[in-house]
Amino acid sequence: MQEFALSLLVLLAGLPTLDANDPEDKDSPFYYDWHSLRVGGLICAGILCALGIIVLMSGKCKCKFSQKPSHRPGDGPPLITPGSAHNC
C-alpha cells in the first residue's frame, strides 16, 4: 500500500512538468526579465541610500564639539533617595 501511495505521489508531482511552458517564451505572462529587475532594484537601493545620507547630513542632527566634558555617572544626584520608595 505504501509503494502504491508513493508511486501515486511521484506521478502527481511530475504531471505539471508535462504541461509546463517553455521558459524562453517571451510572450508568456510568467516570463520575467531578470536583468532589468536587478538593475531597477540596484537603482532603487542607490536612491534610498543617497536619501538616507542626505537626511543624516541635513543639519537636523548637529553635533556640538564645544561642549563641556560629560559628567561621570556618579557625579549626578541620586535617583533613589531614602523615603522615595513606597510599599504596594
Curated annotation (Swiss-Prot):
Per UniProt, subcellular location reads as:
Cell membrane
Instruction: Keywords in alphabetical order, please.
Output: Cell membrane, Glutathionylation, Ion transport, Membrane, Potassium, Potassium transport, Signal, Sodium, Sodium transport, Sodium/potassium transport, Transmembrane, Transmembrane helix, Transport
Q: Which InterPro entries match?
A: FXYD_motif, Ion-transport_regulator_FXYD
The molecular function GO annotations come to:
ATPase binding; sodium channel regulator activity
Which GO cellular component term is one of those annotated?
A: plasma membrane
Q: Organism's domain of life?
A: Eukaryota
User: Which residue ranges does the entry give as Cytoplasmic-facing topology?
Assistant: 60-88
Q: Does the keyword Transmembrane apply?
A: yes
Stretches assigned to the Extracellular side:
21-38
Q: What sections of the protein cross the membrane?
A: 39-59
Q: How does the record describe its quaternary structure?
A: Regulatory subunit of the sodium/potassium-transporting ATPase which is composed of a catalytic alpha subunit, a non-catalytic beta subunit and an additional regulatory subunit. Interacts with catalytic alpha subunit ATP1A1. Also interacts with non-catalytic beta subunit ATP1B1. Interacts with the alpha1-beta1, alpha2-beta1 and alpha3-beta1 NKA isozymes.
In UniProt terms, what function does this protein have? Associates with and regulates the activity of the sodium/potassium-transporting ATPase (NKA) which transports Na(+) out of the cell and K(+) into the cell. Reduces glutathionylation of the NKA beta-1 subunit ATP1B1, thus reversing glutathionylation-mediated inhibition of ATP1B1. Induces a hyperpolarization-activated chloride current when expressed in Xenopus oocytes.
Q: What is this protein called?
A: FXYD domain-containing ion transport regulator 3
Native species: Rattus norvegicus (Rat)
